[in-house]
């Protein structure tokens, strides 16, 4: 490896104004026509075109009032015709050199309107444009594109005439990928990458760069802070998933990848990665708390999904009036009912009209409780939301020094608790109020049900199809589901976990005895489990989670006895996916004098086995992101850092095996890198974060409220596996397939993001699947207020 720190050679420095400008997000409506011209490599330049955009409907309009504005549609046939372009270089001597050009392209829709003019063969057919495309035209030149030379690019058929100067230090290149935020100084794994998929032109040939130097440049001074050698990482045929058919050749990039390792560069500062003959990355930072912006952004996303309260500046940069609160929401009085119908008995856990008779028959009367979490872009509550406080509390237990009181600017009255625990308290506090209202009204006997929705009595848009926010949803009945053991075990678990966190933080809750709540709820769930309930989703996981927390909290041997029986078959081959990790992770990380050494050993082996499996994925994938190798490309597989087990493993081994701990920590970091910029789209997967991010997530309140759009802190589902050749309408994740070139089956999975806000499975999210796991990883990495947690 070639290394050189603080060399005297000076590249091009950037002014503070330039650095700020290139890290600002693009305004809306966006620029159309030729958006930018960037070099891909020594022989290829990319022209990026945008046809137009969508003017979206507003509150009080119908969704079909969207309007597609095509200001500068590209003639793609003309753009790829032989001799469509000429590229002439102006060398230093002043002489002109014309190069032979071959044009290739990729195109996709990146803005979609929500309408269906006609319905033919079970598909929407529109008589007007229903999307706006973006195009990337790759001009392959037989003569090399030299650093420092000026190039004149002309296409008479496109009425295009532009000039550009390329150089490795000053010219941005989308082929150079970095974490757009940056890296910790003590990171054991700082990597940038060189790769590109060029549509029908194949992929960038990285082999000529292997062994050649790269440079990490101090952004303002232009001083070369580090030089290393480009190394080949993996080929385009390298498998990156066990799931066949999700992406061509089981590779999410369809590109050869080379990497640039600058792990030993630890000096804080602002830098860019420069590769001669290609160009440079955007400016990034090396800073101890570099992940804090990502953590705070995602936590604002969690806050934004609180129901029942008014959200407004200075806590959030928008105004959403209080929804679904019988006391605060005008017109919602007497609209929330309790039904004895358990959601776990229904034919569909979302909603089905087949279940409506049972829901109606079970209604016992009104409820006044408010303040659950909205699930996603819609407004319902699910038992899976138990994962939100669990995940936030686990993040705190993993790295308590990383979190403080006041940093998230929450609307809650200050208590001295770290803000992450204040947010974690939100749902248990709602469960407490729900449980005690059910008892006081004689509706219930001590349990709760967490499926709360209005789906059985109307749609989100109302009877007239008029767009509205959650605070305007007042013309239908909402129901809270009947007491069930799954929801109640979940509540018992987070109540006990919260008590443990209060104890660890040296605080107490003056208004709720969480230990008592946990034990009473656990006992109710155990006594009210019906035949078959134990086979419902999350039943065993929440029961295990509750047992773990209650044993740590109380030391009661009955909980340990149950745990020992339930974990008798645990081994290093046990895999703890999703909510299966909850109890074991908390058992290992919580501070408690009651830990059973046998249980610690069992949980440790299972967690480390799971972490090793997640980390093996990072080793095998070119861009080093971890997770479940067998997870299909859906619900956030390409957007969300699901590596909690690796984070736990890093802490569990910190004293016993520091080398292993550092490896685990590095895998969490490189996973975060992927979701914060090293991905093929060169964007973060958090709305509002960084210069490039998801612009149009499916989130109805943000479409209609006043303030910043899109809402900050949303991590969408993102790229989704193809399920049909043709989507049925704009709400279908396959609707965008018709907008792409080459055909969708040739598109690498990681580039199948179309910014289709009409499609829940592409643009939506859930707080439990996407936001909370992201908050855990970025919070774990963000470093303490005094760089605590430094490794």
Model-derived regions, located:
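Sec-dependent signal peptide recognition
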Residues: 1-8
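Low-complexity, Pro/Ser/Thr- and charge-rich linker/hinge segments at domain boundaries
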Residues: 17, 21, 166-190, 280-325
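Aromatic (Trp/Tyr) and acidic
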Residues: 29-39, 43-133, 137, 181-182, ...
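Ser/Thr/Pro-rich, low-complexity mucin-like regions
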Residues: 129-168, 270-279, 783-785
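Acidic, glycine-anchored loop motifs typical of Ca2+
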Residues: 409-420
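Carboxylate/His-rich catalytic cores and anion/metal-binding grooves
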Residues: 418-447
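Flexible helix-coil transition and linker loops at the boundaries of alpha-helical arrays
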Residues: 481-482, 530-535
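Solenoid-like repeat scaffolds
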Residues: 567-574
């Amino acid at each position: 490896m070639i290394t050189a720190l603080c060399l005297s050679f000076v590249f091009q420095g950037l002014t503070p104004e330039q650095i700020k400008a290139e890290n600002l997000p693009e305004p809306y409506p966006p620029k159309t026509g030729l958006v930018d011209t960037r070099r891909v490599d020594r022989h290829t330049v990319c022209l990026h075109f945008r046809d137009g955009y969508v003017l979206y409907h507003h509150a009080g309009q119908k969704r079909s009032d969207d309007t597609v504005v095509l200001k500068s549609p590209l003639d793609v046939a003309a753009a790829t015709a032989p001799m469509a372009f000429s590229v002439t270089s102006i060398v230093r001597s002043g002489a002109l050199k014309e190069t032979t050009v071959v044009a290739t392209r990729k195109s996709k829709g990146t803005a979609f309107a929500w309408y269906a003019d006609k319905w033919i063969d079970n598909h929407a057919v529109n008589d007007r444009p229903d999307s706006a495309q973006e195009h990337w035209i790759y001009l392959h030149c037989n003569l090399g594109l030299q650093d420092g030379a000026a190039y004149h690019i002309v296409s008479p058929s496109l009425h295009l005439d532009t000039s550009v100067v390329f150089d490795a230090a000053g010219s941005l290149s989308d082929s150079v990928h970095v974490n757009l935020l940056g890296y910790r100084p003590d990171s054991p794994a700082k990597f940038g990458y060189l790769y590109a998929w060029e549509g029908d032109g194949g992929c960038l040939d990285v082999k000529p760069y292997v062994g050649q130097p790269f440079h990490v440049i101090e952004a303002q001074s232009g001083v070369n802070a580090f030089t290393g050698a480009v190394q080949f990482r993996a080929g385009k045929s390298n498998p990156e998933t066990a799931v066949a058919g999700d992406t061509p050749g089981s590779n999410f990039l369809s590109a050869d990848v080379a990497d640039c390792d600058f792990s030993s560069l630890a000096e804080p500062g602002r830098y860019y990665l420069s590769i001669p003959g290609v160009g440079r990355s955007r400016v990034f930072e090396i800073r101890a708390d570099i992940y804090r912006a990502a953590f705070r952004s995602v936590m604002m996303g969690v806050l934004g999904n609180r129901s029942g309260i008014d959200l407004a500046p200075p806590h959030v940069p928008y105004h959403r009036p209080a929804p679904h609160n019988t006391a605060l929401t005008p017109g919602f009085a007497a609209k929330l009912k309790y039904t004895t119908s358990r959601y776990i008995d229904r034919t569909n856990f979302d909603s089905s009209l087949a279940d409506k008779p049972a829901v109606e028959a079970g209604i016992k009367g009104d409820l006044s409780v408010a303040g659950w979490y909205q699930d996603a872009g819609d407004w319902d509550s699910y038992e899976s939301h138990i994962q939100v406080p669990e995940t936030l509390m686990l993040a705190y237990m993993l790295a308590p020094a990383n979190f403080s009181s006041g940093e998230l600017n929450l609307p809650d009255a200050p208590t001295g608790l770290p803000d992450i625990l204040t947010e974690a308290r939100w749902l248990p506090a709602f469960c407490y109020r729900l449980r005690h209202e059910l008892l006081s009204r004689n509706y219930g006997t001590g349990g709760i049900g967490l499926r709360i929705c209005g789906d059985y009595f109307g749609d989100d848009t109302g009877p007239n199809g008029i767009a509205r926010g959650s605070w305007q949803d007042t013309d239908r009945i909402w129901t809270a589901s009947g007491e069930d053991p799954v929801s109640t075990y979940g509540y018992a678990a987070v109540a006990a976990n919260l008590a443990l966190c209060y104890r660890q933080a040296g605080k107490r809750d003056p208004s709720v005895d969480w230990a008592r709540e946990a034990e009473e709820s656990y006992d109710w769930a155990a006594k009210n489990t019906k035949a078959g309930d134990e086979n419902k989703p999350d039943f065993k996981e929440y029961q295990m989670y509750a047992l773990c927390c209650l044993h740590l909290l109380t030391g009661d041997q009955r909980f340990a006895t149950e745990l020992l029986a339930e974990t008798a078959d645990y081994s290093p081959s046990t895999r703890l996916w999703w909510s299966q990790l909850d109890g074991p992770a908390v058992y290992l990380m919580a501070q408690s004098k009651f830990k059973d050494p046998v249980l610690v050993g069992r949980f440790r082996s299972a967690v480390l086995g799971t972490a090793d499996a997640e980390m093996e994925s990072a080793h095998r994938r070119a861009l080093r992101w971890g997770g479940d190798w067998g997870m299909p490309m859906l619900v956030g597989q390409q957007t969300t850092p699901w590596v909690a087990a690796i984070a736990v493993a890093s802490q569990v081994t910190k004293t016993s095996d520091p080398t292993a701990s550092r490896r685990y920590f590095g895998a969490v970091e490189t996973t975060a890198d992927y979701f914060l910029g090293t991905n093929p789209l060169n964007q973060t997967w958090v709305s509002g974060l960084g210069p490039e991010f998801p612009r149009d997530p499916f989130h109805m309140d943000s479409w209609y409220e006043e303030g910043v759009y899109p809402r900050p802190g949303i991590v969408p589902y993102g790229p989704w596996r193809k399920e049909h050749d043709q989507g049925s309408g704009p709400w279908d994740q396959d609707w965008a397939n018709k907008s792409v070139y080459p055909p969708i089956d040739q598109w690498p999975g990681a580039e199948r993001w179309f910014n289709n806000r009409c499609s829940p499975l592409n643009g939506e999210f859930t707080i439990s699947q996407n936001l909370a796991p992201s908050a855990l990883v970025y919070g774990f990495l963000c470093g303490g207020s005094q760089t605590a947690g430094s490794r």
